[in-house]
Amino acid sequence: MKQTVYIASPESQQIHVWNLNHEGALTLTQVVDVPGQVQPMVVSPDKRYLYVGVRPEFRVLAYRIAPDDGALTFAAESVLPGSPTHISTDHQGQFVFVGSYNAGNVSVTRLEDGLPVGVVDVVEGLDGCHSANISPDNRTLWVPALKQDRICLFTVSDDGHLVAQDPAEVTTVEGAGPRHMVFHPNEQYAYCVNELNSSVDVWELKDPHGNIECVQTLDMMPENFSDTRWAADIHITPDGRHLYACDRTASLITVFSVSEDGSVLSKEGFQPTETQPRGFNVDYSGKYLIAAGQKSHHISVYEIVGEQGLLHEKGRYAVGQGPMWVVVNAH
């Protein structure tokens, strides 16, 4: 298995393309100049395209991915109704979902043969909308509205329209600020990192009564931390054993172990990392974590080691200016 790592650097308007080898070393293979400040990125389910959101002219760009080395070639673009904060797709590659923090909306862009062709729906009134996350069964779109301390729940219709579910939302504690989410591989639990109080919530997708319930909340910061809390990103290993979340003020990654059924997180330790880590990701093998420092303009690669999933630094690399997003593709 070959793996490619893509790093989005909006301040220099670049995507750096790296080969990740089996020992965790990166080799730079391409630098793409992007027509705008590139921020969120996601790979299509069939691994043929990389979708990126750019500003100040709000668009989603599609880059064709070369199957041999992961190199990018521009393929298409489509206008968006707000500044793109987060970008994702459904599991069948029919739609792109874009959350916009500044516009307070989530939009759905239709894909034809992998290329974006236009917005088919927009839901407004989501103050601080920070991500859009499709459930493993491809039925429910979870959309955190950070400023409203709620996660809105939508069914995605066959034509891409978002229909509010019943109940239409779940709520966090006041002042939490739900931001980014991941799902456990067993499809029974979701995990949400809360930006404003730097905590992680565990959501049981369906309890015995068919309800969605928050079953655990964990503080992700060290006990003696007294500065401003400013959590950013969250990711889980492919086997579901280890979960990671980062805080930008403290410039650290918190390491969690996950119970076998996915219902309980245990805090295992902290890894100091690049300055102001806005984004990171875990590779397909579950062996390596790549973190980007928005203020250090570097990325670091860590090996995931032991039963606790602690991080051991393998290498550090200069990238573009203000790196914010890390995406890994396998081919």
Curated annotation (Swiss-Prot):
A Gene Ontology molecular function term of the record: 6-phosphogluconolactonase activity
Key words, A-Z: Acetylation, Carbohydrate metabolism, Glucose metabolism, Hydrolase
Pathway: Carbohydrate degradation; pentose phosphate pathway; D-ribulose 5-phosphate from D-glucose 6-phosphate (oxidative stage): step 2/3
A Pfam family that the UniProt record links to this protein: Lactonase
Catalytic reaction equation(s): 6-phospho-D-glucono-1,5-lactone + H2O = 6-phospho-D-gluconate + H(+)
N6-acetyllysine PTM positions: K287
EC number, as in UniProt: 3.1.1.31
GO BP terms in the entry: glucose metabolic process; pentose-phosphate shunt, oxidative branch
Catalytic class of the enzyme: hydrolase
GO CC field: cytosol
Matching PANTHER family: 6-PHOSPHOGLUCONOLACTONASE (PTHR30344:SF1), 6-PHOSPHOGLUCONOLACTONASE-RELATED (PTHR30344)
Family: Belongs to the cycloisomerase 2 family.
Function field: Catalyzes the hydrolysis of 6-phosphogluconolactone to 6-phosphogluconate.
Record's protein name: 6-phosphogluconolactonase
Organism per entry: Shigella flexneri
